């Protein structure tokens, strides 16, 4: 089922900024359409295009965990910053844009720009007449621009980004970006004007080059951007792509492209009595497919839409593994798009040699652990070290592997991917844990992202609840994995039994650490990891219920002054954990109204200055878009321990409204379709993709199915019979 029309992106131009642009993407390339119609700008990005070169000043020889622990215990903030945080202020390594095209010769004046999510085709019109259609073809690095005959004479020009020669002085840094593209020492590009093609070839570093080319064929214009290990190969591949596109022709390319999207949207859908939530969900699913294509680089902070304002992308467009990557890839499984999300797991798997190297070199341990702020090769970028170098963030990456197994039921993936990844991570953490005076295992130092920023107070008394929840999750899940694979030996259970219980205050719920509670509003709810996203506490358990209620109530009491965009989706999930659909709906509406650009991009701050938080900046990152979609799904479907419940957090205002969804994925690959009509009739259909048994909470019965089998149920609400 295609997305409803109100979920499309409809804008009135001229579009003044790149982060408000019409966003096209196919997981290989991304394009942003913006500016005045007579000089329309098309920003082009290539998935995985990085300037990998390290600066001449290498990481300090004391860039080690042992030194970090020593400085933390001394309270030496200045030296900690010098060694571990300073590297992040350097401009490289960084994600970089590929360049931009300018389409000249279209009429001046205002215009209507629309992105049809169902087909991923953009159209631009004036006075009701379409003057441009555009798409990025799924499966190939090619964009197509289609014009009516009236505008046959338009021209297309190509420009490289405003890379400098490395001599320009850096502007004063800030917490978001270390400066402009002018700081990057890149050689001049080579221009291409042969065979009707125009563009350039750009060497980036010793490992990377790319080409941006376009060709005008009557009223159709094709463009491509390709990266390779050298200029010659990038040039050859780009020319082949353009020739193949021209040979196939725009209409055939468009037909293939539309078929791909029709199949994609057929995998899941929903219909809600709330257009805002529908829009959040459908746009997030569009961003997922547009940004994450099997065989290509996974989405960094901005996906395939790198900044095009002359500056380095926000936070260098890196991979932040202390929240951002995990939230970016949190919703895809329930949405029944496992192929798009597995891109990130395949990427993490490919980095295992680097993770082992980093565990040895930085932590001095066996096993594997990636830095929490890293470049595309898994190299440490620095940053506030209590978070950017926290070893427990690696466990959050482990959870992503287990969630894939949990929601697909793929036993081979459990055996060949999940178990090895967990075991290698545990080998690193096990060496770092030390036995305290009470016999409990603690880390040498502990923190809770990003409490107390990078001040001395950010080093909490071990173990913080953030670290402790993740450690419990790691060893407890290893016990479950061994049981599921039939080789239980009790080793991991023995380690988990030596971890202290979570620190709880009767008034405020989950604490930051054994001796500190959260006393002020903060964007990260890292102390509440045990509730969400680890789901270690259950509202069905009376003791857990009191902890969940106290924790969430305390966060509400502290207010949203220091929240950012992702905080609202996270709070929605915390409300859903206690079946508070009204609370979840409230937070998702606040997020949608105050933190999204008009094209759906999440801009982190209350950039409209509406008063919902103290941050008024607008750096674009995608993770909160996906987190909000995840919260929408959790309002509709709960799937834990093979118990399935539909509408576990239904807002009061939906009680007499139609609600439906199709093929949302539950545990062990069970696909759930559900409909409730306004007159109280409920229809539930479950389809197994794996053999298994599930308890259906709404019908109070177990169902046992073999792969491919379907079972349906119907019932009426008691008060409407």
How should these model regions be labeled?
Residues 81, 342, 415, 419, ...:
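Conserved positions within tetratricopeptide repeat
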Residues 2-381, 441, 483, 489-559, ...:
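Aromatic-residue-lined binding/catalytic grooves and analogous aromatic/hydrophobic interfacial grooves
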């Amino acid at each position: 089922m295609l997305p409803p029309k109100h979920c499309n992106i409809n804008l009135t131009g001229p579009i003044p900024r790149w982060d408000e642009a019409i966003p096209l993407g196919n997981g290989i390339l991304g394009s942003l359409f913006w500016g005045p119609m007579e000089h329309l700008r098309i920003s082009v990005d290539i998935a995985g295009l990085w300037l990998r070169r390290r600066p001449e000043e290498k990481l300090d020889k004391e860039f080690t965990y042992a030194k970090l622990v020593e400085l933390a215990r001394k309270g030496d903030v200045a030296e900690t910053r010098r060694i571990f945080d300073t590297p992040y202020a350097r401009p490289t390594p960084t994600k970089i844009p590929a360049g931009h095209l300018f389409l000249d010769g279209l009429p001046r004046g205002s215009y209507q720009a629309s992105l049809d999510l169902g087909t991923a085709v953009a159209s631009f019109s004036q006075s009701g007449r379409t003057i441009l259609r555009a798409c990025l073809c799924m499966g190939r690095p090619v964009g197509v621009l289609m014009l009516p005959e009236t505008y046959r004479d338009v021209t297309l020009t190509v420009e490289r980004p405003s890379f400098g020669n490395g001599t320009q002085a850096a502007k004063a840094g800030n917490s978001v970006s270390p400066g402009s593209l002018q700081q990057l020492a890149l050689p001049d590009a080579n221009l291409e004007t042969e065979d009707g093609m125009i563009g350039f070839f750009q060497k980036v570093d010793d490992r990377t080059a790319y080409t941006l080319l376009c060709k005008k064929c009557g009223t159709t214009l094709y463009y491509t951007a390709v990266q390779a290990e050298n200029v010659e190969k990038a040039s050859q591949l780009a020319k082949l792509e353009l020739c193949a596109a021209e040979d196939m022709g725009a209409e055939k390319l468009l037909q293939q492209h539309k078929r791909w999207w029709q199949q994609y949207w057929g995998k899941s859908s929903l219909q809600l009595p709330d257009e805002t939530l529908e829009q959040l969900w459908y746009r997030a699913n569009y961003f997922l497919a547009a940004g994450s294509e099997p065989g290509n680089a996974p989405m960094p902070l901005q996906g395939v839409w790198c900044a095009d304002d002359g500056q380095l992308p926000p936070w260098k467009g890196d991979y932040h593994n202390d929240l951002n990557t995990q939230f970016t890839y949190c919703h895809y499984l329930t949405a029944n798009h496992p192929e798009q999300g597995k891109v990130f797991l395949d990427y993490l798997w490919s980095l295992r040699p680097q993770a082992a190297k980093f565990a040895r070199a930085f932590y001095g341990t066996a096993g594997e652990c990636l830095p929490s702020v890293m470049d595309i090769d898994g190299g440490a970028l620095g940053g506030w070290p209590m978070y950017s170098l926290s070893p427990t963030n690696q466990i959050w990456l482990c959870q992503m592997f287990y969630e894939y197994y949990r929601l697909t039921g793929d036993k081979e993936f459990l055996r060949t991917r999940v178990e090895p990844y967990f075991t290698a991570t545990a080998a690193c953490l096990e060496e770092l844990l030390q036995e305290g005076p009470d016999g409990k295992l603690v880390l040498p130092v502990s923190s809770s992202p990003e409490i107390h920023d990078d001040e001395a107070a950010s080093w909490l008394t071990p173990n913080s609840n953030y670290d402790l929840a993740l450690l419990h999750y790691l060893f407890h899940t290893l016990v479950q994995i061994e049981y599921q694979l039939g080789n239980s030996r009790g080793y991991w259970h023995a380690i988990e039994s030596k971890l202290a219980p979570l620190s709880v205050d009767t008034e405020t719920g989950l604490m930051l650490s054994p001796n500190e509670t959260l006393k002020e509003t903060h964007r990260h709810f890292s102390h509440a990891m045990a509730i969400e996203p680890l789901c270690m506490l259950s509202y069905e358990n009376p003791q857990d219920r009191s902890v969940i209620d106290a924790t969430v109530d305390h966060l509400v009491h502290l207010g949203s002054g220091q929240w950012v965009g992702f905080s609202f989706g996270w709070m929605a999930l915390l409300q859903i954990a206690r079946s508070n659909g009204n609370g979840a709906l409230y937070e998702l509406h606040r997020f949608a109204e105050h933190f999204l650009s008009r094209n759906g991009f999440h801009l982190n701050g209350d950039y409209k200055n509406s008063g919902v938080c103290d941050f008024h900046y607008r750096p674009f990152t995608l993770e909160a878009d996906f987190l909000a979609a995840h919260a929408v799904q959790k309002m509709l479907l709960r799937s834990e321990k093979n118990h399935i419940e539909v509408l576990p957090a239904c807002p009061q205002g939906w009680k007499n409204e139609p609600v439906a969804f199709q093929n949302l994925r539950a545990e062990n690959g069970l696909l759930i379709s559900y409909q409730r009509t306004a007159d109280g009739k409920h229809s539930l259909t479950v389809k197994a993709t794996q053999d298994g048994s599930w308890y259906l909470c709404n019908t109070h019965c177990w169902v046992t199915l073999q792969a491919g089998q379907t079972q349906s149920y119907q019932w009426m609400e008691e008060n409407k019979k």
